[in-house]
Amino acid sequence: MKVIVLGGGVLGVSTAWYLAKAGCQVTVLERQDGVALETSFGNAGQISPGYSAPWAAPGIPLKGLKWMFQRHAPLAITPDGSLYQLQWIAKMLANCNEKAYAVNKGRMMRLAEYSRDKIKELRAETGLQYEGRQGGTLQLLRSQAQVEGMAKDIAVLRECGVDFNVLDPDGCARVEPALAAVKHKLAGGLQLPNDETGDCNLFTSRLAELARDKGVEFRFGVTVDGIENDGKRITGVRIGDELLRADHYVVAMGSYSRDMVKELGIDIPVYPVKGYSLTVPITNPDGAPTSTILDETYKVAITRFDNRIRVGGMAELSGYNLELNPRRRETLEMVVGDLYPNGGDIKAASFWTGLRPMTPDGTPIIGGTRFANLSLNTGHGTLGWTMCAGSGKVLADIITGAKPEISVDGLSMQRYAKQGETLVVPVIRPAVQGA
């Protein structure tokens, strides 16, 4: 089977890898000059199944209103001039209830736990190195109210069989020794010892090299001008005057997936949620984190790579705007400087932004479409790195007719059809004869 994958981020490359392992002839099309140069380039570095939860949660509407008036708020909304932004926010708010949260979190954790296992399997099989660590995640709680508010999350972790440790400030310092100097600022912590970390860009680049060894072709610097169809099947992908044909097609273009498939009559509810990161050179290893922490107050993650600290966070709804907002840098600098003041040269840090493809319910969209030979792998939000291997393997199984190793219930576009979403009629774009 010949498959064309649109998108060379961590999801596209992971999908290509598993398809190639299944015996498919795979071509990856990417507009940048290499893999993982957009959203997969500078993320927070966390592989955190236990923290796989939708942003659409009970209490978020009220918190969102409060955050609007805070300087270092984790969420910001800037009107992008589109009706779609308002519609997407409305759908997200509709998921901010206990019932929807439980269903969505269950789906996300199922996929995330599986994906972590697949990454471990991949590491054992190939020896892939990407500055990975298996030291767990430590969620830092700065107030007693946050400690008490962990009860619901702990109940979910227990129900899902996720290992965890509840810590006091001294316990936090034992897990992350550099926090000893600032433990007076903490009320407690929640550790998930089975979480992992790593450089997503490095992982994707090296996995792409392994994929090439299995015959995957990568074409960089190409722009997909359109997807041709006959109303029932995809007949080719148009790149300038060239029409590329395959037996199956996968769209894994992150936040840009929606525009690519909209002309086909597929309206996927994915919105670009802007995130930021700093990459700080380490100057004092003893003053840096050993694994990764998540500051619950500011929703900022601080992760240790070999000689760097990655500080990532924020959620800004402002469309496809990729401008670097200096106020977001101030927030990231403030958080890492508050917790790890002696770990690295913060002023020498590089500043980055990327667009996470988010669905209103938090669950990604993985699976087929109304076209028999077109599949989607997008909408992972802040968890693309956490869910990449599992998502790639699940979709490869679906495409090749193998039985997925986990339940795929609720992962495809079908869940929106069940909610009464309307889909527009596809525009039929027949292939040019002789192309």
Curated annotation (Swiss-Prot):
UniProt-annotated binding residues for FAD: 3-17
Gene Ontology terms describing biological process: D-alanine catabolic process
Catalytic activity: a D-alpha-amino acid + A + H2O = a 2-oxocarboxylate + AH2 + NH4(+)
SUPFAM superfamilies hit by this protein: FAD-linked reductases, C-terminal domain, FAD/NAD(P)-binding domain
Cofactors: FAD
Gene Ontology CC: cytoplasm; plasma membrane
Pathway(s) it belongs to: Amino-acid degradation; D-alanine degradation; NH(3) and pyruvate from D-alanine: step 1/1
Presence of keyword Iron: no
Entry EC number(s): 1.4.99.-
Gene Ontology molecular-function annotations: D-amino-acid dehydrogenase activity
Enzymatic class: oxidoreductase
Keyword hit for Flavoprotein: yes
Keywords assigned by UniProt, alphabetized: FAD, Flavoprotein, Oxidoreductase
Any Pfam family the entry gives: DAO
PANTHER family per the UniProt record, alphabetical: D-AMINO ACID DEHYDROGENASE (PTHR13847:SF280), SARCOSINE DEHYDROGENASE-RELATED (PTHR13847)
Family: Belongs to the DadA oxidoreductase family.
Protein's recorded name: D-amino acid dehydrogenase
Gene: dadA
